[in-house]
Structures are given as structure tokens and as C-alpha cells.
Amino acid sequence: DPILGPEMKSTGEVMGVGDTFGEAYDKAQLGANSAIPSSGRVFISLRDCDKADGVIVAKSFTALGFELVATRGTAAVISQAGLKVDVVNKVAEGRPHIVDMIKNDGVTLVLNTTEGKQAIKDSASIRRSAENHSVYYTTTLSGGEAICLALEARKKQGQQVRRLQDLHLRVQR
């Protein structure tokens, strides 16, 4: 289950180096064998306290060419901001729901923030399905922002490989 506890939010085993945070994050994800998809459809479901800031992330995804799909409450906030968004049922609301979309390759990326034990439990099937179908998944708004920065950097400069020796020379100057 890829949900992050407090002790896991700041650990990692790969390093990405770039001129910007976005470039470095993109490379780190690639190094962790978790390449960020550059197109498709993003599923967004946000806890209430994240919805206002989530609109900013949704706008970034739209600017990058992604389509949006969201649960009813999140979709209402995104739609009020003037963005096109399709609505999908939560698992408990009946079919077709988000797990069906994931299984049918209907989304390429999931941004799902939760709060409380019940919401975390309810989202377990989404996390499990995303993992089983290799759908990129993040559980925080900051993760969504990082994804957008990574994709913006990739769009601007591509993915450049740099030798560590050259980086060390730059630092020594």
C-alpha cells in the first residue's frame, strides 16, 4: 500500500540532479523506476482542506495537456474555477467508479489526498488498483505540484544526462 506515513515522507534511495527542482524530481522518479506520464487523464480526489489549492494543481495539469476527472465534490470546485472536468463515482457510490476507470486504462495519474481512518481505508482499493495497473499515484498536493514542475521542466529542456565529474567541476569553481 503506497500511502505515506510521517516517517516515509522524507526518505528515498535515488538522487536526481538538475538545474531546477522540477528537472531533479523528474530524474529522481525515473531513477526510482516510477516515470511520470507526460499525457493522459488525471484523477483528482481531494480532502476538503486541499480543494482550494488543488485548483491550482488542476490548472497546471490542464496547461500541460492532461484531461481531468474527479469525484463529485472535487469536480464541483474545479469546475467552478472554469476548468473542464468529468465526474466519476467514488467506489462506495457504485459503478462505474474510479477503480473501474483505472482497470480500463482510463487514467494515467492519480492525485488522491485523504484525511481520517475511514477515508484512508476507503481509498485503499484505489491505491491497490493504481499499483497493479502501473498508474502513477501521489497522496499529497505537494506531490501533485512536484509532478507538474517535473513535466514543465521536461517540456522545456528534455531529459539531459550529466556526468557527475562535470557537476563536481562546477562546484569547485
Predicted feature residues:
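ATP-dependent carboxylate/acyl-activation modules
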Residues: 1-104, 109-139, 144-149, 156-173
